[in-house]
């Protein structure tokens, strides 16, 4: 079974939940370490999504400029 791709918004919400749980200081050190690890993984995924989106936007902008120059 193929794993469903998580949306940017869902990953960001999970990261915010992790940060909130760590900020309130009511979780154990072990749980904090697990949460930190999961948070870092989410940060990396979110960063990749943003970089991919940035690349697509640059391509679209370049195409728009070329279309404008050729008209």
From Swiss-Prot:
Known EC number: 3.1.11.6
Instruction: State where the protein is found.
Output: Cytoplasm
**Is Hydrolase a UniProt keyword of this protein?**
yes
Keyword match Hydrolase? yes
- What keywords is this UniProt entry annotated with? Cytoplasm, Exonuclease, Hydrolase, Nuclease
Report quaternary structure and partners. Answer: Heterooligomer composed of large and small subunits.
Q: What PANTHER family does UniProt report for this protein, alphabetically?
A: EXODEOXYRIBONUCLEASE 7 SMALL SUBUNIT
- What does the protein in this record do? Bidirectionally degrades single-stranded DNA into large acid-insoluble oligonucleotides, which are then degraded further into small acid-soluble oligonucleotides.
What is the similarity comment for this entry? Belongs to the XseB family.
Task: Give the protein name, as stated in the record.
Answer: Exodeoxyribonuclease 7 small subunit
Organism of derivation? Clostridium botulinum (strain Hall / ATCC 3502 / NCTC 13319 / Type A)
State the taxonomy lineage.
Bacteria, Bacillati, Bacillota, Clostridia, Eubacteriales
């Amino acid at each position: 079974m193929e794993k469903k791709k998580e949306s940017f918004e869902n990953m960001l919400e999970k990261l915010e939940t992790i940060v909130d749980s760590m900020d309130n200081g009511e979780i154990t050190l072990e749980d904090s370490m697990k949460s930190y690890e999961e948070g870092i993984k989410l940060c990396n995924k979110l960063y990749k999504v943003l970089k991919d989106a940035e690349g697509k936007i640059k391509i679209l902008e370049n195409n728009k400029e070329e279309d404008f120059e050729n008209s």
